[in-house]
From Swiss-Prot:
Full protein name: Lysophosphatidic acid receptor 3
PROSITE patterns named among the record's database cross-references: G_PROTEIN_RECEP_F1_1 (PS00237), G_PROTEIN_RECEP_F1_2 (PS50262)
Function, as annotated: Receptor for lysophosphatidic acid (LPA), a mediator of diverse cellular activities. Seems to be coupled to the G(i)/G(o) and G(q) families of heteromeric G proteins.
Tissues expressed in: Most abundantly expressed in testes, kidney, and lung, with moderate levels in small intestine, and low levels in heart, stomach, spleen, and adult and perinatal brain. Little or no expression in embryonic brain, liver, or thymus.
Membrane topology: Multi-pass membrane protein
Keyword RNA-binding recorded: no
Organism encoding this protein: Mus musculus (Mouse)
Amino acid sequence: MNECHYDKRMDFFYNRSNTDTADEWTGTKLVIVLCVGTFFCLFIFFSNSLVIAAVITNRKFHFPFYYLLANLAAADFFAGIAYVFLMFNTGPVSKTLTVNRWFLRQGLLDTSLTASLANLLVIAVERHMSIMRMRVHSNLTKKRVTLLILLVWAIAIFMGAVPTLGWNCLCNISACSSLAPIYSRSYLIFWTVSNLLAFFIMVAVYVRIYMYVKRKTNVLSPHTSGSISRRRAPMKLMKTVMTVLGAFVVCWTPGLVVLLLDGLNCKQCNVQHVKRWFLLLALLNSVMNPIIYSYKDEDMYNTMRKMICCALQDSNTERRPSRNPSTIHSRSETGSQYLEDSISQGPVCNKNGS
């Protein structure tokens, strides 16, 4: 019967996997990785919070697609949290961690990836439902969208917890991987292959939908300009989604390939030398998504810009002396109109700075 090592610290497993964490995380490389990672995380928290707030405040975004887009932003926000936790529990500190704390560290990263991937799959279903009917938005109810979002997070949390639940190498040291010293190589193979397979499926689905919409758009009569403009609207959303999917595949595939090579026990692949740079590349995906949303969607860009504008103006107003009562009274007369605009179009900034 194999001996289990639940009470060991991580230095026991790192030493057996010949992973010298202390030497790798010193000097210039450590400073670069931590500085870039910190900047990425701050931007992730700020930009993805803006995306979520934009969807909440702007009625134009109160549709299934944008609710799912906000959930993808929430997954990116969670990825930032996971990376912050990683930065405080990595390098020389890694060897001092308990098994449970290391499981938590890695589980957060696995959960963030699964949440993003599952959310993209749900968006693919939503886009398929709407575009096959040549509609901008699907007829999913808010209740169904909420259930789908809950399902995404339930799957993500479960997948992140699978190694903790038993699929690990604590009782079979010879099966341990190198990059994840208490993950069994069989689990790494399963996890990476399933994710890569999901990538290929999503790419195939989106390419099929894209070609379908393009074919339908090209056969429309040139005399029905109104119909053309309505039918091209789904294509705009599709281009946004495909750009997001492309960025996701580019940023995550190298890291997954490295994990797969480690799972296959490739001794000559030198996976230890590239793992942190590929992790930064994966984190870059959460940085890129809000930029893609705002660049591809003019309404999203305008809403986010107005929110920043309003926040800056509110900050400046607090530093200024109060205005005279007549000015305040004249502004209050238009208050209801501003309120109405803010509900229908998102935050409204007053150009006069009041």
